[in-house]
């Protein structure tokens, strides 16, 4: 099932993606049973996706997908993975902790390594905590690809997702123009350890400092560890503490809606602006109602789809050829972003549908 790579390298060459023969079928039966057991051990604190189908139903290689928290963003990533996996005869086990928890992520990776999954597509909440588990997987010749948030020192073979530094700059310009170059801004995020959050904040601050000197970005960043209740409470407290606050910048998917709800509760909708990342159904509905002013839409479905396609291709052909065929640049595949304002919602929806990306709830 797993590609047989030369010692010391993860993915220099590979066995066929779908193994044949009675011996390997027995191995598959054993693997799926162990995956089920591993899932049960970790299931009390996380949303565990349905287990792979029985080997008799056409079982193939198993690829683990690791998200960061329970949220519709990760539902889209999972769907992208499963849509790419089905025609390839690949099984997907997708796992997210209830909220950001790098320790639980590392435990899950270790369980996948123990049962010998064929590949791993992961988003590390804290690369320092998750990195050792990924390095161990790589040492055992399991191809690992980072998605959404990069972990370049982890031993991963590639990154699939947003160029977060550039996307942060995009968000900064959107908010700078919205405020006409003046005002006080607060940043809210789910993490100050994940690289995607840090890179977005870096790009955002850099643009406002250089291009919008009349805007003040408050030094304190609100951090909620992707806990919605905490995010709203901290945003409400900041509104009370800063009566002249002009805007929130929501770095993670839950931050925009959380800040928007806090603004509405304070009776300051239209006075305090909200610019944020991501375009789930909740974001789109808040854009339509005016609670969110603009969203920088990532493409989570494509992260899952392209990420799985890349892992599968690495298993089949090795990393160098796989990255070349997937059009990677410097080991990365940029899935891009879209800026969506209230007037863009229906056009954006039509574009997603045309691309075959699921659109539900808005």
Go through each PLM region and give its residues:
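Short, hydrophobic alpha-helical segments
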Residues: 113, 175-180, 239, 307, ...
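Hinge/beta->alpha junction and helix N-cap segments in small-molecule ligand-binding domains
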Residues: 66-79, 94-104, 126, 149, ...
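Exported/periplasmic ABC-transporter solute-binding proteins
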Residues: 246-250, 260-329, 333-336, 340-347
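Short, low-complexity disordered leader/linker segments with a strong preference
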Residues: 1-62, 135-142, 361-362
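Hydrophobic alpha-helical
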Residues: 113, 122-138, 204, 219, ...
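Flexible loop/hinge segments that line or gate small-molecule binding clefts
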Residues: 127-166, 174-177, 184, 190, ...
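Hinge/cleft segment of the Venus flytrap/periplasmic-binding protein
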Residues: 45, 54-59, 195-196, 207-209, ...
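Loop/turn elements at helix/coil->beta-strand transitions in domains of secreted/extracellular proteins
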Residues: 90, 116-119, 140-144, 155, ...
């Amino acid at each position: 099932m797993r590609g047989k790579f030369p010692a010391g390298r993860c993915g220099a060459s590979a066995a066929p993606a779908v193994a044949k023969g009675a011996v390997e079928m027995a191995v598959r039966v054993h693997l799926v049973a162990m995956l089920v057991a591993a899932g049960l051990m970790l299931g009390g604190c996380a949303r565990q996706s349905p287990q792979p189908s029985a080997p008799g139903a056409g079982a193939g290689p198993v690829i683990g997908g690791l998200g960061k928290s329970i949220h519709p963003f990760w539902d889209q990533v999972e769907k992208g993975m499963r849509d790419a996996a089905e025609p390839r005869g690949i099984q997907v086990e997708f796992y997210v902790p209830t909220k950001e928890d790098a320790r639980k992520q590392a435990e899950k990776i270790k369980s996948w390594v123990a049962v010998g999954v064929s590949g791993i597509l992961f988003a590390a909440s804290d690369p320092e905590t998750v990195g050792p588990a990924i390095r161990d997987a790589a040492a055992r010749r399991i191809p690992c690809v980072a998605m959404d948030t990069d972990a370049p020192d982890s031993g991963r073979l590639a990154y699939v997702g947003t160029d977060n530094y550039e996307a942060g700059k995009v968000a900064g310009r959107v908010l700078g123009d919205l405020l006409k170059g003046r005002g006080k801004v607060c940043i809210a995020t789910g993490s100050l350890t994940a690289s995607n959050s840090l890179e977005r904040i870096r790009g955002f601050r850099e643009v406002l400092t250089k291009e919008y000197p009349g805007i003040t970005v408050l030094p304190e960043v609100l951090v909620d560890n992707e806990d919605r209740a905490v995010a709203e409470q901290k945003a409400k407290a900041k509104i009370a503490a800063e009566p002249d606050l002009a805007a929130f910048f929501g770095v993670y998917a839950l931050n925009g809606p959380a800040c928007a709800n806090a603004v509405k509760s304070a009776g300051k909708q239209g006075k305090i602006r909200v610019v944020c990342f991501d375009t789930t159904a909740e974001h789109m509905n808040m854009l339509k109602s005016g609670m969110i002013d603009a969203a920088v839409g990532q493409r989570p479905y494509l992260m899952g789809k392209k990420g799985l396609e890349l892992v599968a291709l690495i298993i089949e052909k090795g990393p160098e050829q796989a990255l070349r065929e997937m059009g990677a640049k410097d080991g990365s595949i940029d899935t891009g972003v879209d800026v969506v304002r209230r007037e863009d919602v229906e056009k954006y929806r039509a574009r997603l549908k045309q691309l075959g990306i699921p659109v539900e709830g808005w």
